[in-house]
Amino acid sequence: MHTKTVAKPATSKVNGVDTGIADLFYLSDGKHFGSMREVLDFYHKEVEKSFGEFSSLRNKKRKIRHFLRKHKNLPDDVRRSLIKKMDKLNRMIQKANAPYRKKRHYYQMLDKEIKDAVLSYVSSLDKETITVLELLDIREFNKSRRVNGMFSCFARGKAQQKLMQTLNWKGFDFVEVVPDYTSQVCPECSNLDKANRNGKSFLCTCCGYKGDADHTAGINIKARYLDKNLSKICEDNKYNHKVLQSKLSGYYSRKNELYKQQHPEKFVKKQNSEEQAASAT
């Protein structure tokens, strides 16, 4: 872990950074760096497919071996034929090094994309810029890599680790904030709703705010650092996750109610639009 605890000087520029897949680093100011789409497409289309074929060969060989052990009294010609098939499968397995070659290429692609995105982002920074990131559980990413071969979480964790290491090495300040609800809450009216996000799109079910989902998360990550009330809630409840989520949910609910009171015209307009849409159907 490379977290720095930094003060909040008013003169500093603050970047909220969402670490994702479609866009590797999406900033609160709308800029974005890198993408994992091509890398993950290669993994799913080439690496997974290749290992699937490799596994199929091994399963066929295993079935023949099991059949031979179970049936001791097979005719000689049948037994010889099955042994020949098993030998052929064994030779195919020994020659099938493509899965591991493709897997190595995947890691090379992954490392290059992360390196390029990190260097591009860090090169764009002023010295007084503070980078705000989500606090990610790197252990879970490593577990994901070992257990189920799904590399999207692993890639995201690796990218953020590399970014923190580089920021630390280059002398830039950064801080991590708890990630709860940063992808679900509306940065405009504070409406907290899972339905706000649909893939890469964000559309608030309350005020109608819409935008890129990763950009929206970057905005919320920045707010999680700058908003003193949010910071206090997170700090006071960092060892009790259930209470933390309850406090955050309550805080956003109160802010949303206040927003509705201060901007009633937005909700009247939204209600009229919904009624017109309903009558049209």
Task: Give residue spans per PLM region.
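Positively charged, helix-rich recognition surfaces that bind polyanionic ligands
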Residues: 1-281
